[in-house]
């Protein structure tokens, strides 16, 4: 049998066929590229060189090249995952629960309006973790949750502050994609609770902002309602237009319209 570059290409593709890898063949240069689908990192194999080795070593030459390519791609994948961080992200409860049919995201309930998803972030790529990715990572759901919360606590924070009608509003807006994620940092919330004299109200209208407010009067509730609605409408990834009273580790949604209506009804009865 005469071995050609095309036959060698077919032989290598057969041996290196994996769902997470892609092949690209340059017939002019006689080069076969094998790369990871998600990162696009890969290996170029010059086929004439492999054919020349095959003329001497036959089957052993193909086995050696296939082994080299496989080990190199696996090493690249491990390096990429070791550099990646798992972080939690906050999403609306209306956000899709599946990446596609039969492949649900890894999720945790948070509040009546929000849910926690988990992202694999390697700085260059950002992907929500679903069951298939979880299997590739070789992690359990519990391990993902623990790693994500640990990494969330390492996120820095510096608030801007504004006071209106006696109410103080603190804004976090670093635009790192994880501003809303800081709502999961219990030590951050507790430190803010200690400096707040009135009701502690927290809002995550979209993923790139966290608002914490010290509300001391009804005007403050009206302001936080309008503010949250405005941010929600402008956000690239909106989460919820409702804000929450934070007390003893729990988030209670504030239904402003119902609150104001109740107040008005009380005046009319008086």
Curated annotation (Swiss-Prot):
This is UPF0354 protein BCQ_4506. Belongs to the UPF0354 family. Pfam families: DUF1444. Disulfide bonds: none annotated. It comes from Bacillus cereus (strain Q1). It comes from the Bacteria.
């Amino acid at each position: 049998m005469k071995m050609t570059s095309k036959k060698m290409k077919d032989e290598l593709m057969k041996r290196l066929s994996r769902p997470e890898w892609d092949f690209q063949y340059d017939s002019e240069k006689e080069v076969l590229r094998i790369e990871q689908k998600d990162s696009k990192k890969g290996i170029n194999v010059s086929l004439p060189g492999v054919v020349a080795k095959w003329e001497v070593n036959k089957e052993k030459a193909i086995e050696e090249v296939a082994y080299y390519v496989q080990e190199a791609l696996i090493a690249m994948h491990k390096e990429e995952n070791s550099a990646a961080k798992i972080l939690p992200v906050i999403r609306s409860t209306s956000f899709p629960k599946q990446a596609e049919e039969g492949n649900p995201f890894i999720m945790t309930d948070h509040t009546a309006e929000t849910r926690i998803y988990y992202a694999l972030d390697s700085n260059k790529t950002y992907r929500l973790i679903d069951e298939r990715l979880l299997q590739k990572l070789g992690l359990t759901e519990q391990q993902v949750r623990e790693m994500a919360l640990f990494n969330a606590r390492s996120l820095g924070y510096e608030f801007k502050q504004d006071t209106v009608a006696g109410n103080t509003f603190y804004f976090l807006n670093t635009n790192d994609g994880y501003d809303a994620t800081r709502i999961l940092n219990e030590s951050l919330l507790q430190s803010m609770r200690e400096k707040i004299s009135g009701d502690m109200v927290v809002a995550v209208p979209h993923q790139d902002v966290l608002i914490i407010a010290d509300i001391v009067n009804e005007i403050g509730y009206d302001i936080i309602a309008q503010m949250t609605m405005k941010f929600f409408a402008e956000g690239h990834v909106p989460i919820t237009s409702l804000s929450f009273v934070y007390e003893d580790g729990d988030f209670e949604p504030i239904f402003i319209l119902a609150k104001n209506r109740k107040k008005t009804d009380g005046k009319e009865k008086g």
